[in-house]
Every structure is written in structure tokens, then in C-alpha cells.
UniProtKB/Swiss-Prot annotation:
Protein name, UniProt field: Histidine ammonia-lyase
Enzyme class: lyase
Sites of 2,3-didehydroalanine (Ser) modification: S143
Catalysed transformations (reactions): L-histidine = trans-urocanate + NH4(+)
GO biological process annotation, one example: L-histidine catabolic process to glutamate and formate
EC number: 4.3.1.3
NCBIfam families recorded: hutH (TIGR01225), PRK09367.1 (NF006871)
Family, per entry: Belongs to the PAL/histidase family.
Organism: Bacillus cereus (strain ATCC 14579 / DSM 31 / CCUG 7414 / JCM 2152 / NBRC 15305 / NCIMB 9373 / NCTC 2599 / NRRL B-3711)
Cell compartment(s), UniProt: Cytoplasm
Keyword line: Cytoplasm, Histidine metabolism, Lyase
Length: 506
């Protein structure tokens, strides 16, 4: 099934299908007509010799240098080559695929001035699964993602490298095998390709997709811990959460009640104790607040996915060609920094639940869930590992968006650092997943001491799925492998909505 790009309607759900399920794209004919009409304006500007930034002038600090008509093509090619200054490891292939999709989508708004040929070439790369190799480092997030997008533009010209059929090859290898000809950029097209926020946004979309799945999984894993610690179910009563009024908090409490509705391991207020520690009792409040962050981030991503972030932009049939600053990544920089904090908190509270599972002073379980306390250490060092990841997240959660370093001889004197924020958000999510994996391993072990038959229908199903990934702890072993196995499984599971056999959970 193909997803139609219009420049206005792309959603996160569609991006999920495009990035993770490999669906193809096509362009809306009406939007393509707008692209063609806008291109005519650019060609007339060049023909008439008008002075317009980025079309007949240099770039950045060189904006006052007039470019002769015969040099317009060379200007675009020089721009791409000189700006391809990315460094470091490449973005995940899903991100570079997302960059192609988002760049095509923004051009389909019909205000960038490129030829339809350029849009079609981007779509060909998506549909043939030719994905640019794009280094992760080197973007200031204004003027957009210049370096990363230059590496994307290179491959359209038959230069640079691509991921193709599971290999990293020169772009011309893939183009030749697919029977495609590299394109030669004309006026404005180089700038239109690289002036935008598509690297930070593509990475942000992938991060959001993973974060959403992780947040659902965190609720299910926390529910297993509640059982392992014989938590008090009253704290999740609907009346408590409606009294505060946050929808996300109410929803988390509702899902946990559904997950645990037939559990024989939860307790009532006063049965074993009057109240639980915050890491159990306040799960809806804390996880719910993280869902508030996720909802905010999704809203901003969907705006940016359909935004014209080029410069200059062309309006009213060419009557207005305006230099603006839509390439500035501040909205996504803030959103990604917010995502970092919201997701890091899920690991913070998870690590505290891990401590309650392994600390014999806080429960009546075997110390560190060890099969032979003293002779065998059990889950002792797993808690250390979780604490390390949580601490690392606190460093990564420092806002990238509060920094700015002037560039281009102070012409570009304020930048967003949004791509750094996006990259760090993705790193944090990987760490969160591993912390949750440790909690799950400990919660499964605690469930065995409590009696698996007493678990809820939902958590029991999840327990058995988890045990297919890692065995019960009967002896000390290399737990690093267990943690990674659960983490990989959770990532592949997408979300508990899709993974569980029992629909009662959600």
C-alpha cells in the first residue's frame, strides 16, 4: 500500500509504516502541479537576472555576492559539496529514509521552487530503498540541518554513499543497478534540498515512535512489579485520578487496573501495609506526566513534518519571494529536549522499583532475588547497571537547546542545536528500554517466588513471553546477555497493544 504525500497531511502513524514497515510513497498530483508552477517562477527570476537570495546570490555571509546566469548550476553543486561536512557514525537507516520522505513532503507544499524531477528522485530513492549514508554530527540546527541534508543531496547527484540491499556502497552503484540517472541541480535546488530541519525531525519521529511503545511497555512491566511487591491496588482507584483531572494520569491508572484486574498478588489498603512507596503508588502520576510530554512532542512533530522549512519561500505566483527563518530548528529542539526529560523519568522511577525488588530490607523476597543468597549474587549488579544508565540519562537530558554558537561570520548568530537534542533523545530511549528490561527480569523472578499462578491473566501472558527470551535465575550467569535479549525483544515488540494476546490490558 502506498502513502500519498501532499505536503500537508503526513502523520506520525504514516511515518511509522514508512520507516518500520517499508511502505512506499507517491506524490499527490495537485501538489505536484503546485511544484511545477513554483518552478516556473524560479526560472523567470534567473532569466530576468533578478537579485534573489539563494537563486542568483551566494549563501550565508556571501548573500551579497551576485552570481552570473552561467554559474547558477555550478553554485548549486558547489553548495552541496562544500556543505557535506558531516562527521561521526551514520544515522540509523530509518532516519535517512525519513529524511528523504520529509524533504519530498516539504517540497510538495509548492513554495520551494524545485523541479518536479527533484521530488520524483527523492520518491524513487524511498521506494527503491536507497538510503543515504548521513553522518550524525555536524549540524547546528540552523540554517536547518545543512551538513546532514547535504549528504542526502549528494546521493541524488550520484556522489556519496548509500545503504542499499543490506550494504554500504557508492551511490552510483545503487543508481546503476536500479537504472536511475543522477540529476544535475539547477537554480535554487541545492539550497532547497539542504535548508531545513529534516534530520532532526526524522530522528525525532523515530525517537517518538520508540518512546511511545516504550511508555506502554513501562506500564506493563510496572504492573508486574506491583504484583511482585504485593502492591496496594487502591492507589489506582479511578476516583483518586479523576480528582486531579489530568487525562493522561487517569488513562495510566485505568490501564493498570485493567492489567491487574484479576491478580491475586495485589493487596488492599491496610491488608499488609497502609500505603506503598512513591515508585509504586505514584506510577499514574509519573507515567502520566511522561504521556503529557509524548502528546506534546507528537503534536510538534506533525506540524514540522508538514512544514515549509526552506529559504527563501515563493508565494503568490512569484509576486513574493521572501527570505525568512523557517529553517530554524528551535521548536523541534525544545520538543526533543522535553522528550529527553519525559523519557528519562520513566527510567528514574523504574530503577527505584528495581531497588525495591532486590533490597531485602524493603521486601520479604530473597536478597537480590538470589537462588542462594551469599553464594550467588543474583540480581545485585543488575541494579548497579540500571543506576548507571539512569545517571547517564541525567547527563544526556541536559537541554541542548539552551546552547547557541554563532556561525557564518556572525550572519547566523543564533542556532537551535536541535539535531543534538534529537540524537540524545534517541540515546536516552535506548537506555530507558534497558532499565525496563532489568526491571522485567527482576519482576519475573519475584513473580516466581510469589506464584505465577497468582498473576493476572495479562501479566501471566507477558511473563511467559518474557521467559521465552530469558530463563529463570536458578544460578548466577552472565546477565548482560539477558538484559540485551529482553531489550531487543521489547524493541521488536513495538508496543504491548500489539504484543499481548489478551486484549483486556488496553
Amino acid at each position: 500500500m502506498m502513502i500519498t504525500l501532499t505536503g500537508h497531511t503526513l502523520t506520525v502513524e504514516e511515518m511509522k509504516r514508512l520507516l518500520l514497515e517499508g511502505e512506499g510513497v507517491t506524490a499527490c498530483p495537485t501538489s505536484m502541479q503546485k511544484v511545477a508552477e513554483c518552478r516556473e517562477v524560479v526560472e523567470k527570476i534567473v532569466e530576468d537576472g533578478k537579485v534573489v537570495y539563494g537563486i542568483t546570490t551566494g549563501f550565508g555571509k556571501f548573500s551579497d555576492v551576485l552570481i552570473q546566469k552561467d554559474d547558477v548550476k555550478a553554485l548549486q553543486h558547489n553548495l552541496i559539496q562544500s556543505h557535506a561536512c558531516g562527521i561521526g557514525d551514520p544515522f540509523p537507516e530509518e532516519v535517512s529514509r525519513g529524511m528523504l520522505i520529509l524533504r519530498a513532503n516539504t517540497m510538495l507544499k509548492g513554495v520551494s521552487g524545485v523541479r518536479p524531477l527533484v521530488v520524483n528522485m527523492l520518491l524513487e530513492f524511498v521506494n527503491r530503498k536507497i538510503h543515504p549514508v548521513v553522518p550524525q554530527q555536524g549540524s547546528l540546527g540552523a540554517s536547518g540541518d545543512l551538513a546532514p541534508l547535504s549528504h542526502l543531496a549528494l546521493v541524488l547527484l550520484g556522489e556519496g554513499e548509500v545503504f542499499y540491499k543490506g550494504k554500504r556502497v557508492h551511490a552510483m552503484v545503487a543508481l546503476t543497478e536500479e537504472g536511475l540517472e543522477p540529476i544535475e541541480l539547477e537554480a535554487k535546488e541545492g539550497l532547497a534540498l539542504i535548508n531545513g530541519t529534516q534530520a532532526m525531525t526524522a530522528q525525532g519521529v523515530l525517537s517518538y515512535i520508540e518512546a511511545e511503545a516504550t511508555a506502554y511497555q513501562a506500564e506493563l512491566i510496572a504492573s508486574m512489579t506491583i504484583e511482585g511487591l504485593q502492591g496496594i491496588i487502591d492507589a489506582f482507584d479511578e476516583n483518586v485520578h479523576k480528582a486531579r483531572g489530568y487525562k493522561e494520569q487517569v488513562d495510566v491508572a485505568s490501564r493498570i487496573r485493567d492489567i491487574l484486574h484479576d491478580s491475586k498478588l495485589t493487596t488492599k489498603q491496610g491488608e499488609l501495609r497502609v500505603q506503598d512507596a512513591y515508585s509504586l503508588r505514584c506510577i499514574p502520576q509519573v507515567h502520566g506526566a511522561s504521556w503529557q510530554v509524548l502528546n506534546y512532542v507528537k503534536e510538534k512533530l506533525e506540524i514540522e513534518m508538514n512544514a515549509a522549512t526552506d529559504n527563501p519561500l515563493i508565494f503568490d505566483g512569484g509576486e513574493k519571494v521572501i527570505s525568512g527563518g523557517n529553517f530554524h530548528g528551535q521548536p523541534i529542539a525544545f520538543a526533543m529536549d522535553f522528550l529527553k526529560v519525559g523519557m528519562a523519568e520513566l527510567a528514574n522511577i523504574s530503577e527505584r522499583r528495581i531497588e525495591r525488588l532486590v533490597n531485602p530490607q524493603l521486601n520479604d523476597l530473597p536478597p537480590f532475588l538470589s537462588p542462594e543468597p551469599g553464594l550467588q549474587s543474583g540480581a545485585m549488579i543488575m541494579q548497579y547497571a540500571a543506576a548507571s544508565l539512569v545517571s547517564e540519562n541525567k547527563t544526556l537530558a541536559h537541554p541542548a537547546s539552551v546552547d547557541s554558537i554563532p556561525s557564518s561570520a556572525n550572519q547566523e548568530d543564533h542556532v537551535s542545536m536541535g539535531t543534538i537534542a534529537s540524537r540524545h533523545a534517541h540515546q536516552i530511549i535506548q537506555n530507558v528500554r534497558r532499565v525496563l528490561s532489568i526491571e522485567m527480569i527482576c519482576a519475573m523472578q519475584a513473580a516466581e517466588y510469589r506464584g505465577i499462578e497468582n498473576m493476572s491473566t495479562v501479566t501471566k501472558s507477558f511473563y511467559h513471553q518474557g521467559r521465552q527470551q530469558v530463563p529463570s535465575i536458578t544460578n548466577d550467569r552472565i546477565f548482560s546477555t539477558d538484559i540485551e535479549n529482553i531489550a531487543h525483544w521489547l524493541k521488536a515488540s513495538d508496543s504491548i497493544k500489539e504484543r499481548l494476546d489478551v486484549n483486556a490490558a488496553l
